From Swiss-Prot:
InterPro entries: Atg8-like, Ubiquitin-like_domsf. It comes from Oryza sativa subsp. japonica. This is Putative autophagy-related protein 8E. The keyword Transport applies. Residues 1-30 are annotated as: Disordered. One of its GO terms (molecular function) is phosphatidylethanolamine binding. The lineage of its organism: Eukaryota, Viridiplantae, Streptophyta, Embryophyta, Tracheophyta. The C-terminal Gly is amidated with phosphatidylethanolamine by an activating system similar to that for ubiquitin. Ubiquitin-like modifier involved in autophagosomes formation. May mediate the delivery of the autophagosomes to the vacuole via the microtubule cytoskeleton. Belongs to the ATG8 family. It holds the Pfam family ATG8.
Amino acid sequence: MEERRKEKGKEGRRGKATGHSVDKFSRSNLPEMEKRKLHLPPGTALFVFVNNTLPQTAQLMGSVYESYKDEGDGFLYLCYSSEKTFG
């Protein structure tokens, strides 16, 4: 993947890959799915951002993909953050 990014000249725009696997989910509750995969403890909130935007909670992954996919390579790039919550 890193070689492909360098060939396309996208190294500076996207940075280095994180090494996380890519899964395909068309209808899922993304934050709950990711909390399980990342082994986040109860009481920790997960926030997923796409293009510096927090998508609507009820929005399906297919809709998020169609709205925010990269026009160059067709991938959906996500950033996530966790925060401890009370309760």
